Amino acid sequence: MKVWNKIPIKDNGDKLIAIPSCLKFLDPHPYFHLGAPYKDKTSIWKLREEVINRLVKVNDYLISISSFNLLIYDSWRPLEVQEFMFKRAILLECEKSDIDISFENIKSYPSILKKVEKFWAYPSHDISCPPPHSTGGALDVCLSDKDGNLVEMGSMVCLLYTSPSPRD
């Protein structure tokens, strides 16, 4: 169980709102095209209002001192999307290891779970410890130049588990 699961989460009532156009985000969303069960394309890009307010301030400052922008790679995820991506990551890890698996016996493969849980929170339905992205308070962000190109930052975590197969 990841450390964040031990931290009780209480909803502070901050509204989940659409990310404004002054912030850049990937379009189309990489998980949408994998078949992640978002209700529709317009429901994808949301965060808690306070998170957005802080991101706007950071982005404005970044633009004022450089030619970079924040580029949001992922934001709020409904629990159904979290579950879809978690299961997909497990299947891809099993495929890489040539393991035939069902979700009923996943606990028999702790090494697979350990790899997946490095990047994906378990899709918990417990309201006291939801996956961070499902709260609307977590996001994945990169830097882009003024033309929208990703800035190399030493890691391509953004692309993990988003290609059609693990061999791509």
How would you describe each model-predicted region?
Residues 91-135:
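Acidic, His- and aromatic-enriched active-site or binding-groove loops in soluble protein domains
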Residues 26-44:
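Acidic/histidine-rich, surface-exposed loop or edge segments in extracytoplasmic proteins
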Residues 67-69, 136-140, 150:
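Extracellular structured ligand-interaction cores
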Residues 161-168:
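Conserved small/polar residues in nucleotide/adenosyl-binding loops
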Residues 1-9:
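N-terminal secretory targeting signals
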Residues 44-82, 87-92:
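Active-site acidic/histidine clusters and adjacent loop/turn architecture
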Residues 158:
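Surface-exposed loop and adjacent secondary-structure segments within mature catalytic domains
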